[in-house]
Every structure is written in C-alpha cells, then in structure tokens.
C-alpha cells in the first residue's frame, strides 16, 4: 500500500512510485498497479503458501521470510524498510530488516533485497539498473537479466533522436509479453517519490518546479531566473 507508506513515513509528502522514470516521456504507464491485499493473499494461497501457527506462510517446509537491507545513515530508507516489513506481515510474509553500510550492501545486493534511491531526467536510469553488465551475467545492482529487455535498450541507444527512442524504452519496461513491470519479471519494487521540502523566505515566489531527480544536484534552482519577489 504505497499511499499508506507515504502517510506513515513521509507524513504525506510524496507520491506513489511504480518505476525509476515515473511521468517522464519514456515512462510506460503499464508499470502502475492497484493495491489489493485481498487478491495478494489469494495468490499466495493459490500458489500453496499456507499460514502457519505463527501467521507466517510456509510451503514444502520453507517459510516465507527474507531480509531487507537499508543504509543505516538514512532514516527515511530505514522507515520505508520497516513499513514494508509491517505490510508484508499482514500477508503472512516475515521480513527482517538489516542496516548495512555501502561497503557491505553493494556486494550483498546481488542476492539480498536492498532499499535504494534512484531517479534522474534520463532514460539511462533504466539502462543502469536493468541492462546486463558487460562483464557479468546480470545487471549491476540486482541478479537480473533479460535478453529482450537488453535488446530494446540497445536499440534505444542507437535511435536517431531522444524522442525516437521513447517507444523502445517503454517496451523495455513492458511490451505485452515481457519486461520489468509487475506483469513481467519485476526485479525491483518501487515504493514512493519523495517530495523535497524547503524553507522559503516570506515574499519569495518560487517558480513551478519540474520533477526533481533523486536527492542530488541543484534542481530547486533550475529555473531560478523565473523566481521573483512579491510586490
């Protein structure tokens, strides 16, 4: 429940996220999914995951449990991990959380879920997290590989213009048969887009902001030439 997560963790200052490129021109709206806990439980039951006495599901002697890592220096990521764990418990899945520094997390991320932060004004973000690495058999930040997805992105990079590449980037996300959305391989789960909050001096009129990239840079002053003081 992304909206509940935004309420609990961000005090409402965020929007639901479904991909690394929400609302960008190359965004595929097929990435969006409706929250439905009842259907999620039904799918688990149908797949043979039955609740044990402690409420955690099991199948063939295997408990539905795993660990999610987060950067201990980032309180927001820790809170997101904890909220995710609480919501999973309602489904009968036990999620343990673990603070891990980047020196450890980068290596473990290929076999263990990690709370990341991404987002930039370029479709290369899709390439960075989903394309198979040059010297490996998986993507750089997750154990993911899909030749069809790779092909779409390779073709997109060869397009004559950025605009000509949009459809190929969208197909890399979902082409009706395969991709990285919830109907495809879904190697990443996207939680939320965090609103950047600032103190503003009385009388200063800040121009309408475009979507801010993840956490870095000077996006707030991207259009400072359009700011003005109230008369």
Regions found by a protein language model. Name each.
Residues 50-121, 196:
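Ligand/substrate-recognition segments at binding pockets and active sites
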Residues 1-32, 36-39, 76-85, 105-231:
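Detector for C-terminal structural segments
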Residues 48-51, 160:
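Structural motif corresponding to the C-terminal cap of alpha-helices
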